[in-house]
């Protein structure tokens, strides 16, 4: 993952992790080679090309 992908991923996580994703966000993640799902209000899971998942817990 290059520095642009890391920065973009960080910004998307900080700005959108606890709100609904929109189609343009999904498109950006797909173009960066990232896969996303949103579990029922608990975790956002981002999976890079390596297949490693990053779980981001809900803020308390």
Swiss-Prot record:
Origin, by domain of life? Viruses
The UniProt keyword set, sorted, is: Early protein
Q: What induces it?
A: Expressed in the early phase of the viral replicative cycle.
Family that this chain belongs to: Belongs to the asfivirus MGF 360 family.
What this protein is reported to do is described as: Plays a role in virus cell tropism, and may be required for efficient virus replication in macrophages.
* Other comment: May be a truncated MGF 360 family protein.
Under what name is this protein listed? Answer: Protein MGF 360-5L
Q: Can you name the source organism?
A: African swine fever virus (strain Badajoz 1971 Vero-adapted)
